[in-house]
């Protein structure tokens, strides 16, 4: 390789680096070298927060040119479709043919056109799922959506559950197991990852499979997919249980205090978080003179009265309270 060739290559590489730097944008202040840069959206400027130098001006705004002040206005002014979502088997990128049988002006279409649209609609539904894998995914995601709606969990949980199920399908973990079982386990795993307090009992109530199968499948997919799950904090169940029992914030605060104090003593290890929270609420209701029976608390927490009695005795002994 000649000297002039090497020189040209070095110049080309340097030019490419400059272009990459310009594409990435300014990373530090050319005046003081600080990386504490603040973007001023109203002036379209990039300003150094340390020395005040305007590093960039007249920046391009990638947002829409229109303004909206609420969700309805944003929907009306937006000229794009819905974002992609993991909760649909085709990620929401399909075309849906409306069933209204009306034209763009709201007028009814002819019978010939109606027949044509009916055929198109039927074929559209058929080609949406090209193989058994997609049909499996479509059914599973609809099950996740149904159960999530019944449980009243946020949309983020549905997205996470859908991603977990897609991973399980890709790793061929569905073989030998029911679609409903894996879908329910994915939803339970998503609730735990997102910190949404839902017990296996609550999940099994809205599912079409038994609790034992859900637990068994959940342990299998979490191990195979390497899902890192933190232990469920019993305090996350306290607000919902107290609300259903119509207990005051004083009881809620006392229950949290009991959980914190007794957990530090090591009582929580190996215990069911729902039963532990239920016992703390029962103890707090007695201490705050808002007594609820063990049966009432057990019904709300979906645990047995025996569990509440056992956890209650352990907790009051650890707190040094004589019941």
Swiss-Prot record:
Protein name: Transcription initiation factor IIB 7
Binding annotation for Zn(2+): 29, 32, 48, 51
ZnF locations on chain (TFIIB-type): 24-56
Keywords (A to Z) from UniProt: Metal-binding, Repeat, Transcription, Transcription regulation, Zinc, Zinc-finger
Biased composition (Basic and acidic residues): 1-16
Source species: Halobacterium salinarum (strain ATCC 700922 / JCM 11081 / NRC-1) (Halobacterium halobium)
Cited function: Stabilizes TBP binding to an archaeal box-A promoter. Also responsible for recruiting RNA polymerase II to the pre-initiation complex (DNA-TBP-TFIIB).
Alphabetical list of Gene3D superfamilies matching this protein: 1.10.472.170, Cyclin-like
Top-level taxonomic group: Archaea
């Amino acid at each position: 390789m000649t000297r002039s060739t090497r020189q040209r290559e070095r110049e080309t590489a340097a030019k490419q680096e400059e272009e990459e730097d310009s594409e990435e944008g300014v990373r530090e202040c050319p005046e003081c070298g600080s990386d504490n840069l603040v973007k001023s959206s109203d002036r379209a400027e990039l300003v150094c927060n340390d020395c005040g130098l305007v590093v960039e001006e007249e920046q391009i705004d990638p947002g829409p040119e229109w303004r909206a002040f609420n969700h309805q206005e944003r929907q009306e002014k937006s000229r794009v479709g819905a974002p992609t979502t993991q909760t649909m088997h085709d990620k929401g990128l399909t075309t849906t043919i409306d069933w209204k049988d009306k034209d763009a002006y709201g007028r009814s279409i002819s019978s010939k056109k109606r027949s044509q649209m009916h055929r198109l609609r039927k074929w559209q539904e058929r080609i949406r799922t090209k193989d058994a894998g997609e049909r499996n995914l479509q059914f599973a995601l609809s099950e996740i959506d149904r159960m999530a709606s019944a449980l009243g969990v946020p949309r983020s949980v549905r997205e996470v559950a859908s991603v977990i199920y897609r991973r399980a399908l890709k790793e061929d973990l569905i073989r030998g197991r029911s679609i409903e079982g894996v879908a329910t386990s994915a939803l339970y795993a998503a609730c735990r990852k997102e910190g949404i307090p839902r017990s296996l009992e609550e999940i099994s109530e809205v599912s079409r499979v038994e609790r034992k199968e859900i637990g068994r499948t959940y342990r299998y997919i979490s191990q195979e997919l390497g899902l890192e799950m933190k232990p469920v904090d019993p305090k996350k169940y306290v607000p919902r249980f107290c609300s259903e029992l119509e207990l005051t914030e004083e009881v809620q605060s006392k229950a949290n205090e009991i959980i914190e104090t007794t957990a530090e003593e090591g009582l929580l290890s190996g215990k069911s978080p729902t039963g532990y929270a239920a016992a703390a609420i029962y103890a707090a209701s007695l201490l705050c003179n808002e007594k609820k029976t063990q049966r009432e608390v057990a019904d709300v927490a979906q645990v047995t009265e025996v569990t509440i009695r056992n956890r209650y005795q352990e907790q009051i002994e650890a707190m040094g309270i004589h019941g």
